[in-house]
Design a protein with these regions (language model features):
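Conserved structural motif at the start of ABC-family nucleotide-binding domains
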Residues: 10, 25-27
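C-terminal coupling/interaction segments
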Residues: 2-4, 261-306
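The feature captures the beta-strand-to-loop junction immediately N-terminal to the Walker
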Residues: 41-43
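Conserved ABC ATPase "signature" region
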Residues: 102, 106, 112-127
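ABC transporter nucleotide-binding domain
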Residues: 173-261
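Catalytic Walker B motif of ABC-type/P-loop ATPase nucleotide-binding domains
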Residues: 155-159
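Conserved ABC transporter NBD signature motif
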Residues: 56, 64-74, 78
């Protein structure tokens, strides 16, 4: 990503969206820049898929407006420059993988060769298989292929690696990163923190219908005034949750990960609780820690304002 300002590709301006009496977004402002991967994070129901739906024209805002390349999302000039991979999406069951990609690519003036798309999506070996005979992860790869086949300037990916094995996830990350480096704006809605950290130039955290944090991954993690301590101990997690400054305790294999705002007192108390403790590691807060902390703080603010 360039250090200079990049052109704004897409924007939500004062967007409000409700489902019945439940307002998911309210006065929501959001913009995507060329050459940048923006990860949209938040708890379940925060509105990540709604943002993706509004940007792609699958949903209409109740208030406010959506602009893609200066147009409404329904405008042909906007749709021709966009690639979409949403959570829900069917495939033409009777077509082979290659036929489905070739058919979809035909709608775009800047289509990539079908063989290139299949290679980038990890589908070369499945080119001749019918779409109704694909596994869930294989079908998601085809949906990714359909999203990239038209050389999009805006790529919207909603939970793209669901059903992928680790190697397939990393391969997709490489392709997405290359698209952004070539100038595309990428919106990544995901609940995988490692995916966000691996890909994102910018992270936007949403909760309660609004943006509660926006910045590079390092800046988002720095918002947590806490330290992570990994301990190898025979004691149960419950023994550590009551210690001063402890925000969160979770079990990771044979270890406990303790997130604390008071690392020295926490370590001293840990040694007092378990004199046999010899293995520990002190690190900064993770992106997952930061997300949990930001969302929790937002809930507290909303309760106090009610």
């Amino acid at each position: 990503m360039s250090s200079t300002a990049s052109p704004v590709i897409a924007a939500l301006e004062g967007a409000t969206k409700a489902y019945g009496a439940h307002r998911v977004l309210e006065g929501f402002d959001f913009a995507l820049e060329a050459g940048t991967v923006t990860a949209l994070l938040g708890p379940n129901g925060a509105g990540k898929s709604t943002v993706a739906g509004l940007l792609t024209g699958r949903l209409l805002p109740d208030e406010g407006r959506v602009r893609l390349f200066g147009h409404d999302p329904s405008h042909q000039l906007a749709r021709a420059r966009m690639g979409i991979m949403l959570q829900a999406g069917g495939l033409p069951e009777t077509l082979t993988v290659a036929e489905a990609v070739d058919l979809h690519a035909g709608y775009f003036a800047r289509r990539l060769p079908t063989a290139m798309v299949l290679e980038q999506a990890g589908l070369t070996a499945l080119a001749g298989r019918r779409c109704d005979r694909l596994s869930g992860g294989e079908a998601r790869k085809v949906q990714f292929a359909l999203a990239i086949c038209g050389t999009p300037d805006l790529l919207v990916l909603d939970e793209p690696t669901t059903g992928f094995d680790p190697d397939a996830r990393r391969a997709m990350w490489d392709v997405v990163r290359a698209k952004a480096d070539a100038g595309a704006a990428v919106l990544l809605a995901t609940h995988h923190m490692d995916e966000a950290e691996a890909l994102a130039d910018r992270i936007v955290v949403i909760a309660g219908g609004r943006v509660i944090a926006d910045g590079p991954p390092a800046a988002i993690k720095a918002k947590v005034a806490a330290t992570a301590i990994r301990l190898r101990t025979r004691l149960a997690a419950e023994r550590f949750r009551a210690l001063p400054g402890v925000v969160k305790v979770e079990t990771i294999g044979a270890d406990l990960s303790v997130l604390t705002t008071a690392p020295r007192p926490t370590l001293e108390a840990a040694f007092a609780l378990d004199p046999a403790l010899v293995h520990f590691e002190v690190t900064g807060a993770s992106l997952e820690d930061a997300l949990a902390n930001l969302v929790s703080a937002n809930r507290t603010i909303l309760k106090e304002a009610a």
